[in-house]
Amino acid sequence: MKVRNSLSALKKVPGAQIVRRRGRTFVINKLNPRMKARQG
C-alpha cells in the first residue's frame, strides 16, 4: 500500500477502483493487486 498525494495516475490503470473508507480515498485493483494506494 502506497501513500500518495495524487491518485489520478493510479486510477487510469486498468481494473482500478476508487473507494472511500473512513474519510480516506483508496485505490484498489483486483486485476493487479500491487496497485494499491491511499491518499493523504
Curated annotation (Swiss-Prot):
Keyword Ribonucleoprotein included in the entry's annotation: yes
Keywords, alphabetical: Ribonucleoprotein, Ribosomal protein
Matches recorded under Pfam families: Ribosomal_L36 (PF00444)
SUPFAM superfamilies the UniProt entry points to: Ribosomal protein L36 (SSF57840)
InterPro entries: Ribosomal_bL36 (IPR000473), Ribosomal_bL36_sp (IPR035977), Ribosomal_L36_bact (IPR047621)
GO function terms (MF aspect): structural constituent of ribosome
HAMAP family assigned: Ribosomal_bL36
PANTHER family per record: 50S RIBOSOMAL PROTEIN L36 2, LARGE RIBOSOMAL SUBUNIT PROTEIN BL36B
Descriptive protein name: Large ribosomal subunit protein bL36A
Species of origin: Renibacterium salmoninarum (strain ATCC 33209 / DSM 20767 / JCM 11484 / NBRC 15589 / NCIMB 2235)
